[in-house]
């Protein structure tokens, strides 16, 4: 086995491959810089005179094969659909690491694996892509909007309660084709995904995070590896972003408290300003949208998320009693 050979596991969609290619690119770039400066820090186990050799391995997940509405897929959570087979290959030592969209990751990480690195975050917002270039406020009554997320459905109806929501599945290009073929008047997609596949020009309207909250972790890349693989863990440290990690921890903690998934109407977003973590959260259920924001120390992201969740739950209880 070559010392410098690394296999990255990824789904086969254009978006997943673009994300994996980006991670491959920055790993090679950082490694070459260390090689040039002969400064490898604590990284061990590589032939420091040779370049990294990185291969992408496409792994088909259950979510790629089963395109039914999420609510009709039994025996697994929605988030397990896109990672389980990849995690299995990692545990069997068939791949060294995997690149995931954080918002697709389950709360529970399998024993032996570690969410080790959060190298970057793209725009966390959602966007409207309409067939005729109309913004949300300009769409006709009873226009058909495509989304597979209860959060997006609730946020859409909070802004326009005279729209028809229709489920949609598939990758970005599949969804855009369904839109262009006339199945929908508009669809909602993550800005991050559109940008990463070079389709930001299709965006009709960017939604403001206060009025249309993104999913926790939206736009963040997560790199997973084996917990006992010190060689890969040390390598991933060179591309980890501490700010993104803090945002990840805050938003994942918020999601965990509300048992967040595509069937849970919650949203969360954060920004880092110096040593301050600014966190926004939304819970939208039973016809009532609760939105709160809070600021805390970036060194204590989970604590900040817990305080925000507590404020939202307090408001929810008040509504139920009133």
How would you describe each model-predicted region?
Residues 7-9, 57, 98, 116, ...:
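Short, well-ordered beta-strand segments
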Residues 68-96:
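Short, structured active-site "lid" loops
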Residues 2-60, 65-66, 73-75, 158-322:
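Small-molecule-sensing regulatory modules
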Residues 85-86, 135, 174-175:
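Short acidic active-site motifs
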Residues 86, 91-100, 182-192:
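Alpha-to-beta junction loops
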Residues 14-21, 25, 78-81, 107, ...:
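N-terminal winged-helix
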Residues 102-103, 111-162:
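A conserved helix-loop-strand patch within extracytoplasmic ligand-binding domains
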């Amino acid at each position: 086995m070559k010392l410098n050979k690394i296999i990255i596991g990824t789904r086969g969609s254009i978006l997943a491959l673009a994300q994996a290619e980006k991670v491959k690119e920055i790993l090679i770039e950082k490694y070459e810089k260390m090689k040039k400066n002969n400064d490898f820090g604590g990284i061990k186990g590589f032939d420091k005179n040779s370049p990294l050799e990185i291969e992408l391995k496409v792994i088909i997940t259950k979510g790629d094969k089963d395109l039914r509405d999420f609510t009709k897929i039994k025996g697994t959570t929605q988030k397990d659909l896109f990672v389980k087979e990849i995690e299995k290959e990692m545990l069997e030592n068939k791949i060294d690491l995997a690149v995931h969209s954080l918002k697709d990751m389950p709360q529970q990480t399998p024993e032996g694996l570690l969410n080790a690195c959060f190298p970057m975050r793209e725009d966390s917002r959602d966007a409207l892509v309409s067939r005729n270039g109309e913004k949300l406020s300009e769409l006709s009554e009873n226009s058909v909007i495509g989304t597979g997320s209860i959060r997006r459905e609730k946020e859409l109806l909070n802004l326009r309660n005279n729209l028809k929501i229709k489920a949609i599945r598939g990758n970005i290009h599949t969804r855009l084709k369904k839109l262009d073929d006339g199945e929908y008047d508009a669809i909602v997609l993550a800005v991050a995904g559109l940008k990463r596949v070079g389709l930001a020009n299709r965006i009709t309207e960017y939604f403001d995070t206060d009025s249309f909250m993104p999913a926790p972790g939206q736009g963040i890349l997560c790199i997973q590896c084996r917990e006992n693989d010190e060689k890969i863990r040390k390598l991933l440290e060179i591309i980890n972003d501490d700010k993104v990690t803090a945002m990840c921890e805050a938003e994942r903690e918020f999601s965990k408290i509300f048992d967040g998934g595509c069937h849970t109407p919650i949203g969360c977003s954060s920004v880092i300003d110096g040593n301050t973590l600014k966190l926004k959260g939304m819970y939208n259920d039973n016809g009532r949208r609760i939105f709160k924001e809070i600021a805390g120390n970036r060194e204590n992201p989970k604590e900040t998320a817990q305080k925000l969740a507590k404020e939202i739950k307090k408001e929810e209880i008040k509504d139920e009693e009133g």
